[in-house]
Amino acid sequence: MTRCIHCSRCVRFTDEIAGYQELGMSYRNNHVEVMPFIGKTVDSELSGNIIDVCPVGALTSKPFRDTVRSWELSRRKSITPHDALGSNVQVHVDKYHKVVRVLPLENETLNECWLSDRDRFSYEGLYHEERITTPKVKQDGKWVEVDWDTALTYAAKSINGVKMDHGSDAIGVLASAISTTEELHILQKMMRAVGVNNLDTRLDQQDFSGDGKLQGVPYLGSSVSDFINNKALLVVGSLLRQEQPLVMQRLRQATKNGSELHLMKKMFWLKLSLKSRSIRGRLPIPWGKF
């Protein structure tokens, strides 16, 4: 921290934006240090943004540090894959086409200039040693690596075999909900070509009784940027700090602006401003108004 100029921007970010003051200024004069509270760590889901707000580079990204020079990187615009918000990001790629850093791309209607930690650092999973990067076919009870032509031929024969024996309705396809639109389009096009129409991405949903009543996309006609202007907001069955930290940040700004926040969930772990005081803790109530 020898570069630190004690501007306290990181401290203010954790308090004013992230909502959890996990950093503070200790000691006095030229001995001042920025540090977490004794025995504590920085656990905010938005903590990576303090790297961006630091004006002198005293706070850096550990996975990226000392890997490549910034001017050697190519920059690609993209969308975050880990939430439904569609936050804009800038993916930095080195000369070997390897992703080495992900930064937020400013979009005031979505993520503003912030980014959640899971979208900032999850690129490391692309190169994890346990990630499967080549197709595998099970032979004699063991998984054997094969080329793509062999794997696709094997899959086609297996699908056609089930179709011939049991009909196309006996085949179902479940895809990840975080797949890209292009990936899902190719998958459904391929499966419909062989007569399979049972496709879905709702891996966790158990009750489908209300699907027939849905018309179009369940959209309420409001964007996250409108939260600050709403008089009241309702959150149903979601722990936003973990599931949608950027939405939670928007809700905090709305409550600071005077909006009422209503929550419907069995247990909560929140810190939301309420006039001159704050509420923080686990509240065993089915309905809360803050």
Q: What are the functions of these language-model segments?
A:
Residues 56:
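Alpha-helical segments that scaffold the active site and NAD(P)H-binding pocket
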Residues 51-53:
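Transmembrane-helix bundle segments that line or gate the permeation/cavity pathway
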Residues 32-46:
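Aromatic/His-enriched, Gly/Pro-containing loop or helix-boundary segments
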Residues 21-34, 206-208:
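Short, conserved phosphate-binding/catalytic loop or strand-edge motifs used
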Residues 1, 6-7, 11-12, 17-18, ...:
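Catalytic alpha/large subunits of respiratory electron-transfer oxidoreductases
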